[in-house]
Amino acid sequence: MESDLTTEHHLPFIRIHKNGRVERLSGNDIKPTSLNPQNDVVSKDVMYSSDHNLSVRMFLPNKSRKLDTAGNKIPLLIYFHGGAYIIQSPFSPVYHNYLTEVVITANCLAVSVQYRLAPEHPVPAAYDDSWSAIQWIFSHSDDWINEYADFDRVFIAGDSAGANISHHMGIRAGKEKLSPTIKGIVMVHPGFWGKEPIDEHDVQDGEVRNKIAYIWENIVSPNSVDGVNDPWFNVVGSGSDVSEMGCEKVLVAVAGKDVFWRQGLAYAAKLEKSQWKGSVEVIEEEEEGHCFHLHNHNSQNASKLMQKFLEFIIS
Protein backbone atom coordinates (compact mmCIF):
# COMPACT_ATOMS: atom_id res chain seq x y z
CA MET A 1 0.00 0.00 0.00
CA GLU A 2 1.27 3.45 -0.93
CA SER A 3 2.53 5.53 1.96
CA ASP A 4 0.41 8.48 3.12
CA LEU A 5 3.34 10.40 4.59
CA THR A 6 3.06 14.16 4.25
CA THR A 7 5.32 15.46 1.52
CA GLU A 8 4.23 19.09 1.12
CA HIS A 9 3.02 21.65 3.66
CA HIS A 10 1.15 24.69 2.38
CA LEU A 11 0.19 26.30 5.66
CA PRO A 12 -2.32 27.49 6.69
CA PHE A 13 -4.34 25.99 3.84
CA ILE A 14 -3.50 22.39 2.97
CA ARG A 15 -1.12 19.46 3.17
CA ILE A 16 -0.53 17.37 0.08
CA HIS A 17 0.36 13.78 0.95
CA LYS A 18 2.71 11.52 -0.92
CA ASN A 19 -0.15 9.52 -2.42
CA GLY A 20 -1.74 12.72 -3.75
CA ARG A 21 -4.37 13.09 -1.05
CA VAL A 22 -5.16 16.73 -0.26
CA GLU A 23 -5.79 17.48 3.41
CA ARG A 24 -7.53 20.81 3.99
CA LEU A 25 -6.57 22.34 7.32
CA SER A 26 -9.58 24.63 7.74
CA GLY A 27 -12.95 25.40 6.23
CA ASN A 28 -14.11 21.78 6.39
CA ASP A 29 -16.88 22.08 8.99
CA ILE A 30 -20.43 22.08 7.68
CA LYS A 31 -23.34 23.88 9.28
CA PRO A 32 -26.71 22.30 8.43
CA THR A 33 -29.49 24.17 6.70
CA SER A 34 -32.86 24.66 8.34
CA LEU A 35 -36.36 25.38 7.09
CA ASN A 36 -37.20 26.21 10.69
CA PRO A 37 -36.13 29.84 11.14
CA GLN A 38 -32.67 30.31 12.63
CA ASN A 39 -32.19 33.97 13.60
CA ASP A 40 -35.33 34.56 11.52
CA VAL A 41 -33.69 33.13 8.37
CA VAL A 42 -34.46 29.87 6.58
CA SER A 43 -31.92 28.10 4.38
CA LYS A 44 -31.59 25.22 1.94
CA ASP A 45 -29.05 23.66 -0.43
CA VAL A 46 -29.85 23.16 -4.11
CA MET A 47 -27.63 21.44 -6.67
CA TYR A 48 -26.84 23.58 -9.71
CA SER A 49 -24.29 21.33 -11.44
CA SER A 50 -24.81 17.58 -11.44
CA ASP A 51 -21.71 17.20 -13.62
CA HIS A 52 -19.47 18.52 -10.85
CA ASN A 53 -21.72 17.84 -7.83
CA LEU A 54 -21.92 21.53 -6.94
CA SER A 55 -24.64 23.27 -4.95
CA VAL A 56 -25.70 26.69 -3.82
CA ARG A 57 -26.83 27.50 -0.30
CA MET A 58 -29.84 29.79 -0.26
CA PHE A 59 -30.86 32.11 2.57
CA LEU A 60 -34.29 33.71 2.85
CA PRO A 61 -35.70 36.04 5.54
CA ASN A 62 -38.51 34.14 7.19
CA LYS A 63 -40.75 37.20 7.09
CA SER A 64 -40.59 37.18 3.28
CA ARG A 65 -42.45 33.87 3.25
CA LYS A 66 -45.41 35.59 4.90
CA LEU A 67 -45.71 38.35 2.29
CA ASP A 68 -48.12 38.50 -0.59
CA THR A 69 -45.51 37.99 -3.32
CA ALA A 70 -47.16 40.37 -5.78
CA GLY A 71 -45.08 43.54 -5.66
CA ASN A 72 -43.11 42.40 -2.63
CA LYS A 73 -40.06 40.71 -4.14
CA ILE A 74 -36.71 41.35 -2.50
CA PRO A 75 -33.15 41.97 -3.75
CA LEU A 76 -31.14 38.95 -4.90
CA LEU A 77 -27.55 38.64 -3.68
CA ILE A 78 -25.17 36.15 -5.34
CA TYR A 79 -22.20 35.51 -3.05
CA PHE A 80 -18.77 33.98 -3.71
CA HIS A 81 -16.77 32.86 -0.67
CA GLY A 82 -13.05 33.40 -0.11
CA GLY A 83 -10.34 30.97 0.89
CA ALA A 84 -7.55 31.46 -1.67
CA TYR A 85 -9.38 29.18 -4.14
CA ILE A 86 -8.18 26.32 -1.91
CA ILE A 87 -10.42 26.09 1.17
CA GLN A 88 -13.88 27.02 2.48
CA SER A 89 -17.39 26.58 1.10
CA PRO A 90 -20.85 28.13 1.42
CA PHE A 91 -21.62 25.44 4.00
CA SER A 92 -18.94 26.35 6.55
CA PRO A 93 -20.12 28.03 9.77
CA VAL A 94 -18.23 31.26 9.05
CA TYR A 95 -20.01 31.84 5.73
CA HIS A 96 -23.36 30.43 6.81
CA ASN A 97 -23.40 32.79 9.79
CA TYR A 98 -22.21 35.76 7.76
CA LEU A 99 -24.81 35.31 5.01
CA THR A 100 -27.49 34.86 7.65
CA GLU A 101 -26.53 38.25 9.08
CA VAL A 102 -26.45 39.88 5.65
CA VAL A 103 -29.87 38.51 4.74
CA ILE A 104 -31.60 39.57 7.93
CA THR A 105 -29.95 43.02 7.80
CA ALA A 106 -30.56 43.76 4.11
CA ASN A 107 -33.81 41.80 3.72
CA CYS A 108 -32.58 40.02 0.61
CA LEU A 109 -32.49 36.51 -0.84
CA ALA A 110 -28.87 35.31 -0.84
CA VAL A 111 -27.46 32.54 -3.00
CA SER A 112 -24.00 31.45 -1.81
CA VAL A 113 -22.10 29.57 -4.52
CA GLN A 114 -19.96 26.46 -4.17
CA TYR A 115 -17.16 26.16 -6.73
CA ARG A 116 -14.42 23.59 -7.31
CA LEU A 117 -11.22 24.13 -5.35
CA ALA A 118 -7.53 23.91 -6.19
CA PRO A 119 -5.22 22.03 -6.34
CA GLU A 120 -7.54 19.27 -7.55
CA HIS A 121 -9.28 21.76 -9.83
CA PRO A 122 -6.95 24.64 -10.75
CA VAL A 123 -8.08 28.00 -12.06
CA PRO A 124 -10.08 28.65 -14.22
CA ALA A 125 -12.40 25.99 -12.71
CA ALA A 126 -13.61 28.40 -10.00
CA TYR A 127 -14.53 31.03 -12.59
CA ASP A 128 -16.24 28.53 -14.88
CA ASP A 129 -18.31 27.16 -12.01
CA SER A 130 -19.24 30.63 -10.78
CA TRP A 131 -20.52 31.63 -14.20
CA SER A 132 -22.46 28.37 -14.46
CA ALA A 133 -24.09 29.19 -11.13
CA ILE A 134 -25.11 32.64 -12.36
CA GLN A 135 -26.62 31.10 -15.48
CA TRP A 136 -28.50 28.60 -13.34
CA ILE A 137 -29.84 31.37 -11.11
CA PHE A 138 -30.94 33.41 -14.12
CA SER A 139 -32.72 30.36 -15.56
CA HIS A 140 -35.24 30.57 -12.68
CA SER A 141 -34.78 26.89 -11.85
CA ASP A 142 -35.67 27.24 -8.15
CA ASP A 143 -38.95 28.09 -6.47
CA TRP A 144 -37.43 30.58 -4.00
CA ILE A 145 -35.80 32.47 -6.85
CA ASN A 146 -39.04 32.54 -8.81
CA GLU A 147 -41.18 33.58 -5.89
CA TYR A 148 -38.99 36.07 -4.02
CA ALA A 149 -36.13 37.39 -6.20
CA ASP A 150 -36.43 40.84 -7.75
CA PHE A 151 -34.32 40.63 -10.91
CA ASP A 152 -34.25 44.41 -11.17
CA ARG A 153 -32.15 44.33 -7.99
CA VAL A 154 -29.49 41.66 -8.51
CA PHE A 155 -26.18 42.07 -6.68
CA ILE A 156 -22.94 40.10 -6.69
CA ALA A 157 -20.57 40.07 -3.73
CA GLY A 158 -17.55 38.23 -2.40
CA ASP A 159 -14.51 38.48 -0.17
CA SER A 160 -10.83 37.83 -0.98
CA ALA A 161 -10.73 35.22 -3.77
CA GLY A 162 -14.51 35.55 -3.94
CA ALA A 163 -14.16 39.29 -4.55
CA ASN A 164 -11.75 38.53 -7.38
CA ILE A 165 -14.34 36.11 -8.79
CA SER A 166 -17.01 38.80 -8.40
CA HIS A 167 -14.96 41.16 -10.57
CA HIS A 168 -14.55 38.59 -13.31
CA MET A 169 -18.25 37.70 -13.19
CA GLY A 170 -19.05 41.39 -13.62
CA ILE A 171 -16.79 41.63 -16.65
CA ARG A 172 -18.27 38.49 -18.19
CA ALA A 173 -21.80 39.72 -17.51
CA GLY A 174 -20.94 42.88 -19.42
CA LYS A 175 -19.31 41.09 -22.33
CA GLU A 176 -22.09 38.54 -22.68
CA LYS A 177 -24.88 41.08 -22.14
CA LEU A 178 -26.37 39.23 -19.19
CA SER A 179 -30.05 40.10 -18.89
CA PRO A 180 -31.42 41.35 -16.60
CA THR A 181 -28.31 43.31 -15.76
CA ILE A 182 -26.45 43.26 -12.45
CA LYS A 183 -27.26 46.31 -10.35
CA GLY A 184 -24.12 46.32 -8.21
CA ILE A 185 -21.05 44.40 -7.06
CA VAL A 186 -19.47 44.42 -3.59
CA MET A 187 -15.79 43.39 -3.39
CA VAL A 188 -14.46 42.98 0.14
CA HIS A 189 -10.65 42.87 0.39
CA PRO A 190 -10.32 41.68 -3.23
CA GLY A 191 -7.51 39.25 -3.97
CA PHE A 192 -5.61 41.01 -6.76
CA TRP A 193 -1.84 40.73 -7.12
CA GLY A 194 1.20 41.12 -9.39
CA LYS A 195 4.92 40.45 -9.50
CA GLU A 196 5.79 44.06 -8.69
CA PRO A 197 4.37 46.34 -5.96
CA ILE A 198 1.45 48.36 -7.26
CA ASP A 199 2.76 51.66 -5.81
CA GLU A 200 5.29 53.06 -3.33
CA HIS A 201 2.99 52.25 -0.39
CA ASP A 202 2.73 48.56 -1.30
CA VAL A 203 5.57 47.56 1.01
CA GLN A 204 5.09 43.82 1.46
CA ASP A 205 8.34 42.07 2.33
CA GLY A 206 9.91 39.56 -0.01
CA GLU A 207 8.79 36.56 2.02
CA VAL A 208 5.13 37.58 1.76
CA ARG A 209 5.37 38.22 -1.97
CA ASN A 210 7.17 34.93 -2.53
CA LYS A 211 4.59 32.98 -0.54
CA ILE A 212 1.66 34.45 -2.46
CA ALA A 213 3.45 33.80 -5.75
CA TYR A 214 4.24 30.22 -4.74
CA ILE A 215 0.63 29.45 -3.78
CA TRP A 216 -0.74 30.90 -7.03
CA GLU A 217 1.86 29.38 -9.33
CA ASN A 218 2.08 25.93 -7.74
CA ILE A 219 -1.35 25.26 -6.25
CA VAL A 220 -4.03 27.59 -7.58
CA SER A 221 -2.98 28.04 -11.20
CA PRO A 222 0.11 25.99 -12.13
CA ASN A 223 -0.61 26.44 -15.83
CA SER A 224 -0.43 30.25 -15.71
CA VAL A 225 2.12 31.35 -18.31
CA ASP A 226 2.69 34.68 -16.56
CA GLY A 227 2.58 33.43 -12.97
CA VAL A 228 1.05 36.03 -10.65
CA ASN A 229 0.83 38.42 -13.60
CA ASP A 230 -1.88 36.18 -15.01
CA PRO A 231 -4.84 38.48 -15.82
CA TRP A 232 -7.05 36.36 -13.56
CA PHE A 233 -4.93 37.51 -10.61
CA ASN A 234 -3.25 40.71 -11.80
CA VAL A 235 -6.35 42.65 -12.73
CA VAL A 236 -4.85 46.08 -12.04
CA GLY A 237 -1.43 45.85 -13.67
CA SER A 238 -1.88 43.34 -16.47
CA GLY A 239 -3.59 45.68 -18.90
CA SER A 240 -6.99 44.06 -18.35
CA ASP A 241 -9.84 46.14 -19.73
CA VAL A 242 -12.36 46.88 -16.99
CA SER A 243 -14.57 49.17 -19.07
CA GLU A 244 -17.02 46.36 -19.87
CA MET A 245 -17.98 45.88 -16.23
CA GLY A 246 -21.59 44.74 -16.41
CA CYS A 247 -23.18 46.56 -13.49
CA GLU A 248 -24.27 50.03 -12.44
CA LYS A 249 -22.10 50.47 -9.36
CA VAL A 250 -19.24 48.89 -7.41
CA LEU A 251 -18.32 49.02 -3.72
CA VAL A 252 -14.71 48.14 -2.87
CA ALA A 253 -13.81 47.51 0.78
CA VAL A 254 -10.13 47.57 1.78
CA ALA A 255 -8.24 47.18 5.05
CA GLY A 256 -4.99 48.96 5.90
CA LYS A 257 -3.33 45.89 7.44
CA ASP A 258 -4.31 43.60 4.57
CA VAL A 259 -1.66 42.48 2.06
CA PHE A 260 -4.15 43.31 -0.72
CA TRP A 261 -4.82 46.85 0.58
CA ARG A 262 -3.04 48.85 -2.12
CA GLN A 263 -4.21 46.54 -4.89
CA GLY A 264 -7.81 47.16 -3.84
CA LEU A 265 -7.37 50.92 -3.90
CA ALA A 266 -5.60 50.77 -7.26
CA TYR A 267 -8.41 48.62 -8.64
CA ALA A 268 -11.05 51.15 -7.62
CA ALA A 269 -8.99 53.95 -9.20
CA LYS A 270 -8.58 51.95 -12.42
CA LEU A 271 -12.30 51.30 -12.64
CA GLU A 272 -13.11 54.95 -12.00
CA LYS A 273 -10.70 56.15 -14.72
CA SER A 274 -11.93 53.65 -17.31
CA GLN A 275 -14.65 54.15 -19.91
CA TRP A 276 -17.11 52.29 -17.71
CA LYS A 277 -20.19 54.42 -17.04
CA GLY A 278 -20.91 53.23 -13.51
CA SER A 279 -19.96 54.59 -10.09
CA VAL A 280 -17.29 53.38 -7.66
CA GLU A 281 -17.28 53.74 -3.88
CA VAL A 282 -14.48 52.77 -1.49
CA ILE A 283 -14.69 52.02 2.22
CA GLU A 284 -11.36 51.76 4.03
CA GLU A 285 -10.57 50.56 7.55
CA GLU A 286 -6.93 51.49 8.18
CA GLU A 287 -6.42 49.47 11.38
CA GLU A 288 -8.00 46.21 10.25
CA GLY A 289 -6.64 43.10 8.56
CA HIS A 290 -7.79 40.74 5.85
CA CYS A 291 -11.45 39.66 6.21
CA PHE A 292 -11.62 40.96 9.77
CA HIS A 293 -15.41 41.17 9.51
CA LEU A 294 -15.74 37.38 9.24
CA HIS A 295 -13.75 36.68 12.38
CA ASN A 296 -14.83 39.59 14.58
CA HIS A 297 -18.30 40.32 13.27
CA ASN A 298 -19.44 42.09 16.43
CA SER A 299 -16.73 44.75 16.24
CA GLN A 300 -17.52 48.38 15.52
CA ASN A 301 -15.72 48.31 12.17
CA ALA A 302 -17.47 45.10 11.12
CA SER A 303 -20.80 46.75 11.92
CA LYS A 304 -19.75 49.78 9.89
CA LEU A 305 -18.92 47.56 6.91
CA MET A 306 -22.24 45.73 7.24
CA GLN A 307 -24.09 49.06 7.31
CA LYS A 308 -22.32 50.16 4.12
CA PHE A 309 -23.21 46.82 2.53
CA LEU A 310 -26.85 47.40 3.51
CA GLU A 311 -26.91 50.95 2.14
CA PHE A 312 -25.38 49.75 -1.13
CA ILE A 313 -28.10 47.16 -1.63
CA ILE A 314 -31.11 49.27 -0.68
CA SER A 315 -30.05 52.57 -2.30
From Swiss-Prot:
Which top-level group of life is the source organism from? Eukaryota
Question: For the modification N-acetylmethionine, which residues carry it?
Answer: 1
> Matching InterPro entries, A to Z?
AB_hydrolase_3, AB_hydrolase_fold, Carboxylest/Gibb_receptor
Which Gene3D superfamilies does the record associate with it?
Answer: alpha/beta hydrolase (3.40.50.1820)
Which reactions does this protein catalyse? a carboxylic ester + H2O = an alcohol + a carboxylate + H(+)
Q: In what tissue types does this protein appear?
A: Expressed in flowers and siliques.
Q: Name one GO molecular function term.
A: carboxylesterase activity
**Cited Pfam families:** Abhydrolase_3
Keyword annotations: Acetylation, Hydrolase, Serine esterase
* Motif Involved in the stabilization of the negatively charged intermediate by the formation of the oxyanion hole: positions: 81-83
The positions flagged as active site in the entry are: 160, 258, 290
Q: What is its EC number?
A: 3.1.1.1
Q: Which family does it belong to?
A: Belongs to the 'GDXG' lipolytic enzyme family.
Q: What does this protein do?
A: Carboxylesterase acting on esters with varying acyl chain length.
What this protein is called in its record is Probable carboxylesterase 3
Organism placement in taxonomy = Eukaryota, Viridiplantae, Streptophyta, Embryophyta, Tracheophyta
